[in-house]
Amino acid sequence: MTALEAKEKADAAKQSLFKEAFEKTVEYLNEQIEKIASEGRYYFYAYPNDEDLIEAIGEREAKELSYNPDLQTALRKKFEADGFLVTFSRNCVFESTIKISWEELLK
């Protein structure tokens, strides 16, 4: 395998992980939005190190969600287009927080 082939293979694997993480996270967050909205709340927090999220989207995808700013931007844009405010913050090196809200948008 040449260096170029190795690079292309690595790029393809990275793109595949990005796509899987994006799709699984969108599905998970949509389920959570439906659940929280039915309870009458207007926001919720998700944590990439949370066992429920890891079980739903996968460990690799959860790590990608926590550390990939391009994935975070893509998710933010997707949900903003649907009327949700999504913010990502990092409290420390190992813990990040995702807040999804829609109350501000109702005003």
Language model segments and positions:
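Well-ordered, non-membrane alpha-helical segments in soluble/globular domains
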Residues: V26, L65-L75
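Short, charged/polar micro-motifs that form catalytic or ligand-binding hotspots
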Residues: E61-P69, R90-V93
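A general, composition-driven signal for non-globular sequence regions
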Residues: M1-A3, E8, D70-Q72, V93-I98
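An N-terminal amphipathic alpha-helical segment
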Residues: M1-K63
